[in-house]
């Protein structure tokens, strides 16, 4: 067969195979055209699930008479005119294929009138060459598109259509998504002459929760946490459901928008899932309605024919930005009291009322005095190797979906850790223990283990969510896992033989501070640098550029102001005291597994060998079995 140019109708039908998947696809394309035309009211009429009729009427700008024929032609659009326009597209449509494709697989009529025209005009295309016919019509300012008998001339496509109910369900879902994208537009949806949905426009700054509740349901609205997050050209707003209240039905609500365009993006979903993974069940998914605003030059929407996907030029930056925004609001909501065996500090927190993070961040407000934010834990709770497995290994294990919720039980990783626990080589403790803080001074010391001991012992099981049962030399002991984790965090923060490894922040955190706070930070800057916290003072602002690994995933907009308050109350605090304070804020109360307990103990023994010989108070509690044995022998 020789190479030849395809007839216009056949070419349009091929394009329709990519754009027009089902009636819902037609509704999406036509409603997006109405929104691009500036419509504030859109009426959608559906008959027989869209197979018989799809009618979209809007009050937008309309189309001039001499442009109607072009509107039905391929690759004709008013949205872009050059490559520069394509690379910075802000309209929903831009391909110029939708109307031509739809008209090739249906009987489409386009009726429109602009404000400066006295009469309306109607256009339709027919025949092999898709010739456009234009005739006068009666119509108000705006546009009406009628799509009759969808797929009437492509039987193969028509037989793949589902039942009327199923097709309308897909249309309803598309309309729901569009209604969530444009709160300022009234949208009405009817099916077979019956009004099914009425979404009234939200005027100005009026609350949007009413429409949100009508679309997502009262259950989502009850657990929804508002997000307002901004950095430079990136802005994130919307709602995410509190993980504890997320059910299987609620998890079906996953709507994300990029510059107002509804999107299915794996990067965005992964960032949100990662932010919620510690608080969700193993089979749970987060529920959210989120809007991402980004510089149009930094995102490519010309990826998918139906414009369902985008490609970010700086995907890692976008991922971390969304992750930090979601983590921030979850931590703000899930603030828990200190889960330690020692009382919290009595000194009141030093918090000015005018602290605002850069970008009008709403989550820089101080937490209540008796509570601190529950923060993501970067400790090496999960390990795929021996005792030297660091927090990076823990994080990668946590991200695979199974480890965060592992149930107690013997595994290969546990066996390797058991072996390493019992074969830890002798280490000569340093003359000054860097992990000793004032907390140890006020707590009675636990009984010292044997001088030749270099291991806390073997983890047998968990007797509660955060208490492990240990065995060594035939003796049993209870271990407070939260206390062990706190000392481990403190040891990771303190400088040792080499300078602490400061991790540069992808998005530096900039906070506004008062004159007194500037003096405090100036005085503490050398200490913070030794702990791996790099700050830059500039007038009445402080910028955090790098933090040590344990602080990498923390909400610094909350943590740093609280740290300033602590330094104001404790001006003579040394490195160990500051590290101890930070460690208390890194510990989060949550159930442990045996594998987590083994990994934490192994790392603690490696970093703090002196604790094995002289455990601090509150860490270990020996169990005396002799009375029970005497009772059994009736002695």
Swiss-Prot record:
Composition bias type Low complexity, residue spans: 383-402
- CDD domains in alphabetical order: HATPase_MutL-MLH-PMS-like, MutL_Trans_MutL
Q: List compositional bias (Basic and acidic residues) regions by residue number.
A: 367-379
Protein biosynthesis among keywords = no
Can the keyword DNA-binding be found in this entry's annotation?
no
Gene Ontology molecular function: any one: mismatched DNA binding
Q: Which InterPro entries match?
A: DNA_mismatch_repair_CS (IPR014762), DNA_mismatch_repair_MutL (IPR020667), DNA_mismatch_S5_2-like (IPR013507), HATPase_C_sf (IPR036890), MutL/Mlh/PMS (IPR002099), MutL/Mlh/Pms-like (IPR038973), MutL_C (IPR014790), MutL_C_dimsub (IPR042120)
Which residue spans traverse the membrane?
none
Region Disordered, as annotated, extends over: 359-410
What Pfam family is a match for this entry? MutL_C
Name the UniProt key words of this record, in alphabetical order: DNA damage, DNA repair
Gene Ontology CC, one term: mismatch repair complex
Alphabetical GO biological process terms: mismatch repair
NCBIfam families referenced in this protein's UniProt entry, alphabetically: mutl (TIGR00585), PRK00095.1-1 (NF000948)
Question: Tell me, what does this protein do in biology?
Answer: This protein is involved in the repair of mismatches in DNA. It is required for dam-dependent methyl-directed DNA mismatch repair. May act as a 'molecular matchmaker', a protein that promotes the formation of a stable complex between two or more DNA-binding proteins in an ATP-dependent manner without itself being part of a final effector complex.
Q: Which family does it belong to?
A: Belongs to the DNA mismatch repair MutL/HexB family.
Q: What is this protein called?
A: DNA mismatch repair protein MutL
Protein species of origin: Cronobacter sakazakii (strain ATCC BAA-894)
UniProt lists the gene as mutL
């Amino acid at each position: 067969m020789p190479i030849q140019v395809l007839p216009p109708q056949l070419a349009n039908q091929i394009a329709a195979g990519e754009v027009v998947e089902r009636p819902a696809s037609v509704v999406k394309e036509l409603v997006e055209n109405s929104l691009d035309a500036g419509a504030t009211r859109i009426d959608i009429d559906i008959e027989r699930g869209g197979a018989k009729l799809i009618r979209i009427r809007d009050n937008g700008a309309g189309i001039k008479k001499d442009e109607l024929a072009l509107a039905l032609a391929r690759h004709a659009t008013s949205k872009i005119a050059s490559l520069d326009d394509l690379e910075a597209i802000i309209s929903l449509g831009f391909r110029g294929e939708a109307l031509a494709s739809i008209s090739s697989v249906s009987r489409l009529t386009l009726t429109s009138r602009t404000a400066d025209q006295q009469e309306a005009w109607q256009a339709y295309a027919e025949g092999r060459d898709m010739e456009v016919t234009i005739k006068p019509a009666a119509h108000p300012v705006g546009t009406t598109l009628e799509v009759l008998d969808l797929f009437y001339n492509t039987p193969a496509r028509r037989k793949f259509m589902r039942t009327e109910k199923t097709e309308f369900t897909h249309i309803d879902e598309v309309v729901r998504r569009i209604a969530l994208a444009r709160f300022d537009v009234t949208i009405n949806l009817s099916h077979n002459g019956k009004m099914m949905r009425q979404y009234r426009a939200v005027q100005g700054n009026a609350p949007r929760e009413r429409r949100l509740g009508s679309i997502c349901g009262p259950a989502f609205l009850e657990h929804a946490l508002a997000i307002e997050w901004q950095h430079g050209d990136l802005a994130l707003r919307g709602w995410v459901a509190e993980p504890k209240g997320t059910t299987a039905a609620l998890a079906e609500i996953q709507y994300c928008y990029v510059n107002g365009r509804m999107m299915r993006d794996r990067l965005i979903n992964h960032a949100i899932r990662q932010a919620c993974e510690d608080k969700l069940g193993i089979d749970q998914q987060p529920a959210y309605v989120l809007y991402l605003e980004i510089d149009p030059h930094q995102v490519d929407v010309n990826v998918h024919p139906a414009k369902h996907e985008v490609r970010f030029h700086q995907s890692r930056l976008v991922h971390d930005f969304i992750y930090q925004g979601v983590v921030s609001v979850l931590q703000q909501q899930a603030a828990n009291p200190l889960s330690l065996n020692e009382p919290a500090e009595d000194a009141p927190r030093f918090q000015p009322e005018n602290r605002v993070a850069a970008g009008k961040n709403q989550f820089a407000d101080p937490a209540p005095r008796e509570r601190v934010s529950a923060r993501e834990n970067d400790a090496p709770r999960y390990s795929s190797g021996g005792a030297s497995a660091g927090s990076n290994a823990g994080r990668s294990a946590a991200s695979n979906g199974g480890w965060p919720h592992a149930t107690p039980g013997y595994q290969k990783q546990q066996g390797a850790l058991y072996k390493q626990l019992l074969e830890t080589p002798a280490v000569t403790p340093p003359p000054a223990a860097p992990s000793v803080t004032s907390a140890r001074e006020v707590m009675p010391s636990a009984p010292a283990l044997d001088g030749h001991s270099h291991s806390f012992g073997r983890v047998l099981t968990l007797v509660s969510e955060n208490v492990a049962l240990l065995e060594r030399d035939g003796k049993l002991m209870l271990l407070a896992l939260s206390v062990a984790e706190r000392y481990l965090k403190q040891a990771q923060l303190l400088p040792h033989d080499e300078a602490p490894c400061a991790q540069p922040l992808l998005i530096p955190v900039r906070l506004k501070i008062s004159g007194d706070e500037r003096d405090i930070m100036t005085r503490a800057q050398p200490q913070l640098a030794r702990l791996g916290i790099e700050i830059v003072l500039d007038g009445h602002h402080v910028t955090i550029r790098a933090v040590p690994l344990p602080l990498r995933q923390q909400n610094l907009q909350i943590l740093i102001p609280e740290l300033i308050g602590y330094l104001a109350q404790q001006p003579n605090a040394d490195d160990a005291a500051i590290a101890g304070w930070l460690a208390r804020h890194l510990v989060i109360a949550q159930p442990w597994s045996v594998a987590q307990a083994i990994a934490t103990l192994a790392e603690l023994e490696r970093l703090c060998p002196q604790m094995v010989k002289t455990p601090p108070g509150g860490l270990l509690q020996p169990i005396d079995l002799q009375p029970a044995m005497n009772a059994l022998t009736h002695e």
